[in-house]
Swiss-Prot record:
InterPro entries: CheD-like_sf, Chemorcpt_Glu_NH3ase_CheD, Cytotoxic_necrot_fac-like_cat. Belongs to the CheD family. Keywords: Chemotaxis, Hydrolase. Probably deamidates glutamine residues to glutamate on methyl-accepting chemotaxis receptors (MCPs), playing an important role in chemotaxis. The gene is cheD1. Its EC number is 3.5.1.44. It comes from Chromobacterium violaceum (strain ATCC 12472 / DSM 30191 / JCM 1249 / CCUG 213 / NBRC 12614 / NCIMB 9131 / NCTC 9757 / MK). PANTHER family: CHEMORECEPTOR GLUTAMINE DEAMIDASE CHED 1-RELATED (PTHR35147:SF3), CHEMORECEPTOR GLUTAMINE DEAMIDASE CHED-RELATED (PTHR35147). This is Probable chemoreceptor glutamine deamidase CheD 1.
Length: 193
């Protein structure tokens, strides 16, 4: 039986145990594919499936707005003046920061959670791939620290994929260790890139 990590709840009017998400979505349901990001209001729920990629959630508890990204690599090298891409951690964070600036809310009032960075390859394969999961994790932690964000929780590393659900209304994030069969059920719709 796979290990299910604990949920990381924020204050919520929902009286169900924090380990089970609400049965019905409150509004817009968004699925993030690798390289996607989304920022929304209290009517938004954001889902994704992570392997070695990392997701960062940013949430404002009073305004009930927030976003999540799903990045593949820590940074792009070299950056040739191309438009920002959610495929890279530093650029995905900049895309979310643009949305936060548009709200007029102070950045330091947002709360962060870090999820993902599983080692999906054998140790000798990781050496050949420059250990992408570790670099992704280091990048996420560095950005949160540099921006002065409050880090509420992290669920990083390991060797199993994760299913993630972020409810912007409550700030709750549910994380489930995934099985291969579940990964094949990912929606094929696209969001922002």
């Amino acid at each position: 039986m796979p290990h299910t990590p604990p949920a990381y709840p924020a204050a919520s009017a929902d009286h169900r145990p924090p380990s089970s998400p609400p049965a019905e979505p409150a509004g817009e349901a968004v699925f993030l594919h690798p390289g996607d990001w989304h920022f929304g209001d209290s009517q938004t729920r954001i889902r994704t499936l992570l392997g070695s990629c990392v997701s960062i959630t940013l949430w404002h508890p009073q305004a009930k707005v927030g976003g999540m990204c799903h990045y593949l690599l820590a940074q792009r090298t070299p950056h040739r003046g191309e438009s920002l891409s959610g495929r890279y951690g530093d650029e995905a964070m900049l895309l979310l920061l643009r949305e936060i600036l548009d709200t007029g809310l102070p950045l330091q009032e947002f709360q962060a959670r870090l999820i993902g960075g599983a080692s999906m390859l054998l140790s000798r394969e990781r050496k050949l791939s420059h250990d992408v999961p570790s670099r992704n994790i280091q990048q996420a932690r560095l950005m949160v620290k540099q921006l002065g964000l409050k880090l509420l929780a992290e669920d990083l590393g390991g060797n199993c994929p994760r299913m993630v659900l972020f409810d912007v209304a409550s700030g709750n994030v549910w994380i489930k260790q995934s099985q291969e069969a579940e990964l094949e059920q990912a929606p094929h719709t696209r969001t922002r890139k």
